[in-house]
UniProtKB/Swiss-Prot annotation:
Composition bias type Acidic residues, residue spans: 230-240
Protein name in UniProt: Immediate-early protein 3
Recorded superkingdom: Viruses
Region (Disordered): 119-155, 180-383
Bias (Basic and acidic residues): 198-213
Main location: host cell
GO cellular component: host cell nucleus
Keywords, in A-Z order: Activator, Early protein, G1/S host cell cycle checkpoint dysregulation by virus, Host nucleus, Host-virus interaction, Modulation of host cell cycle by virus, Phosphoprotein, Transcription, Transcription regulation
UniProt key word Phosphoprotein: yes
Annotated organism of origin: Murid herpesvirus 1 (strain Smith) (MuHV-1)
Length: 611
């Protein structure tokens, strides 16, 4: 073997420095260890014999990022001997296994072990992984799967921690409706134990809202704005706030919260109009606030982040049962109730949290309870009339049913609403309407007059009507109806016999008209028109003129979509007795004689200011 370069850090050929270092004669034909090699390794190499070792690479080159050929048989034998010599403890067992021929280890590992470089732990060197798109995609998928698994374990632990016992679940979530006597017996000890200040803060507001009474000079105004149904409205608002957490608003008809219902079809509007029926309210037991396992995580985080148990939020209030009820957003202070599981129908009282159910099964039960009911809801509108016609007249017959399908006699074809892009009648001029309104105000006959407002259901007209209703709502002494639809029956031309019989009965008098026979000759159900109507009635002339001008401004903006008419009521009175006092006060102030003064002239005669 040729002598290696002197720069070799691991093994070098004998030279003068090596001779002086080892203190003996060295053979130039042999390979000896360098001074940088540990002593026990150098002695082992010297005692091993005449076997040669590769020394063409430095230690830095061996530990660098290079690929090496497989070691030779002589190198494997030498590495095995070194491993047997230093492999007494457990830390060198990995070196012995790595030096074996079955592991196909390269010379770098052998050189590191010979130079005394050993790791503190038993772990192997880091494995180089390929940097390919497929491998990165596989790694991301594996990491995401592991993260989801850890999150699922955490959710299970949280669900077990928050899951109440069976007795607590029955106590909290089975809502009973006790009688008033039971409720009073339960509330009496609470009132006695509570402080007077705490009792004065809550009890007067509840009693005053129930009975509509207020102390002081504003008692009459309070009676007007507070009715006996205020308690029901408050509870309905609280339930709507809770429905936002438990997601029960999906099962309700969304057209109820729109100011003009759903589609143009008569059936859709009829079904939506029947969804707002009033519910009877009973006082519930006071239950402690508790997070239910069915509560969604978003609701738990929101409740935990809330600074107090009271907060301000916009509350949606429906003031009527129809689908055209005026929708208002009112800011108020509501109390957060405890979260309740979603309920549907009559199964709400039977729902209780199961102690052994898993999270997946409880989620499925929650989705089943939130699903809307498939049972048809009978409204109090045209559906009842349709059923009555089916029972009495022998079945509903659409006007053009014979054109659609002659053979299928059992099918009932629905009649769509009479749709009009523009109003089907010609409106009157604003000058004529304003002149008539002034004439009514001169005659002091406003109490038996009212305004009829008709408009189509286009989007821009509907928004303008809502703004007009809001402006009129700020005026006093007005009675404004909710927008409503009109039903129309089938037009039929009367025969000559019917005309003569009616004329003879009217000539004979009231008894003849009362005894006159009526002949019904049609079986069709009334059809609704898609345009809406409103009635506005005022108590005094200033309020009547203000409402007339507001409606005239709207009709001038939409001359073909909005129409206003003035109507008279035979023997009309105020819609509510609360306006009687303001009408009397207006009349008395107009014809009051206290301000009329009399002046005496020089001749001794009296002269009035009215002359």
């Amino acid at each position: 073997m040729e002598p290696a370069a002197p720069s070799c850090n691991m093994i070098m050929i004998a030279d003068q420095a090596s001779v002086n270092a080892h203190g003996r004669h060295l053979d130039e034909n042999r390979v000896y260890p360098s001074d940088k090699v540990p002593a026990h390794v150098a002695n082992k190499i010297l005692e091993s014999g005449t076997e040669t070792v590769r020394c063409d690479l430095t230690l830095e080159d061996m530990l660098g990022d290079y690929e090496y050929d497989d070691p030779t048989e002589e190198e494997k034998i030498l590495m095995d001997r070194i491993a047997d010599h230093v492999g007494n403890d457990n830390s060198d067992m990995a070196i012995k296994h790595a030096a074996g021929p079955e592991m196909n280890i390269d010379i770098v590992t052998a050189a590191a072990s010979m130079s005394g470089i050993t790791t503190a732990s038993h772990s192997a060197l880091p494995i180089r992984r390929p940097n390919t798109p497929d491998f990165r995609r596989h790694s991301e998928k594996k990491a995401k799967k592991h993260k989801n698994k850890q999150r699922q374990r955490l959710d299970d632990v949280v669900a077990k921690l928050h899951k109440p016992s069976e007795s607590e679940a029955d106590e909290d979530f089975i809502f009973q409706q006790p009688q008033e006597e039971e409720y009073q017996e339960e509330q009496e000890p609470q009132v006695i134990s509570s402080s007077p200040q705490h009792f004065d803060e809550r009890s007067p507001s509840r009693s005053s809202s129930d009975h509509g009474g207020h102390s002081g000079g504003n008692s009459r105004d309070g009676q007007f704005y507070l009715s006996s149904g205020s308690e029901d409205e408050d509870d309905e608002d609280d339930e709507r706030v809770d429905s936002g957490y438990r997601g029960s608003s999906r099962s309700e008809d969304s057209s109820r919260y729109r100011p003009h219902g759903g589609s143009h079809s008569s059936r859709s509007s009829i079904k939506s109009s029947g969804s707002g029926s009033s519910r009877h309210h009973h006082k519930r037991k006071a239950v402690p606030e508790r997070h239910h396992p069915f509560t969604p995580p978003s609701a738990k985080r929101y409740a935990a982040a809330a600074p107090s148990s009271r907060y301000e939020c916009p509350v949606r209030v429906d003031s009527s049962d129809s689908d055209d009820a005026p929708t208002m957003v009112q800011r108020g202070t509501l109390k957060i109730k405890s979260f309740r599981p979603p309920s549907s129908g009559s199964n709400s009282n039977k729902h209780s949290s199961s102690s052994g159910g898993s999270t997946s099964s409880s989620h499925k039960k929650q989705q089943q309870q939130q699903a809307p009911s498939k049972k048809p809801v009978m409204s109090s509108g045209s559906d009842k009339i349709r059923d009555m016609v089916d029972r009495t007249a022998g079945g509903y017959v659409a006007p053009n049913a014979h054109k659609k399908c002659r053979e299928d006699k059992s099918r009932k074809y629905p009649a769509r609403a009479l749709e009009y892009k523009n109003l089907p009648f010609r409106p009157q001029s604003p000058q004529y309407l304003l002149g008539k309104a002034i004439q009514f105000c001169k005659e002091e006959t406003v109490h038996d007059k009212f305004i009829m407002l008709f408009y189509t259901r286009s989007q821009d007209v509907r928004k303008a009507v809502d703004e007009t209703r809001a402006r009129m709502g700020m005026r006093p002494n007005l009675s404004i109806s909710c927008p409503f639809m009109t039903e129309h029956t089938k037009p039929i031309n009367h025969s000559r016999e019917t005309i003569d019989r009616t004329s003879a009965a009217c000539t004979a008098g009231t008894q003849a008209v009362w005894d006159m026979e009526e002949r019904r000759g049609q079986k069709c159900v009334p059809r609704t028109s898609d345009y809406r109507s409103m009635i506005i009635q005022a108590a005094n002339p200033p309020d009547f003129l203000g409402a007339v001008k507001t409606c005239l401004h709207l009709s001038q903006v939409f001359p073909k979509q909005v129409c206003m008419r003035l109507c008279s009521i035979t023997g009309g009175l105020n819609p509510l007795p609360i306006y009687e006092e303001t009408v009397s006060s207006y009349v008395n102030a107009q014809f009051e004689a206290d301000d009329i003064s009399h002046h005496e002239d020089e001749s001794g005669e009296y002269e009035s200011d009215c002359e």
